[in-house]
Amino acid sequence: QIFNQTKCDGVKIEGNAELVDVIKYLTKKNIPVMAHVGLQPQKFSSASKFKIYGRKEDDLKNILNDCKALEKAGAISLLLEGILTEIATQITFASKIPTIGIGASEYCDGQILVSEDMLGMFTEYHPKFVKKYANLCSNIQNAIKRFSSEVNNNKFPNKKFRYD
């Protein structure tokens, strides 16, 4: 009911093969599911716990098996985050559904970045795979400082910005 009321196009769920039953249930209800594998930031409270997926010996086998299971369960696409290039490439070529990469190489079918990261909204930690296309944090801070200064120095508001 909520899905229909919000008019969203689908849901994204972080996890691995443990999600198979959830994905099957949702797809039976005609709710498209994007499965998010690899680095799963919503599961961590601290950026220091982020780790790149694929450095352990069993990672390749595990994630390939997870992706096959998620695809078979009905996922419409796979979001691959923070995964080594070799693994992301193998997943992309093995999958019948699109792969979307965020820190998973140019070999995925599509790419995404978190808007706040690519727009430079944060000055703290950001993953290696984030390219900043702007520095809005600095621009916003400067705008607020200018506003505050103009208010404190009685330069704003002025005649230009009032109704007489």
What are these regions (language model features)?
Residues 1-164:
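Alpha/beta enzyme core
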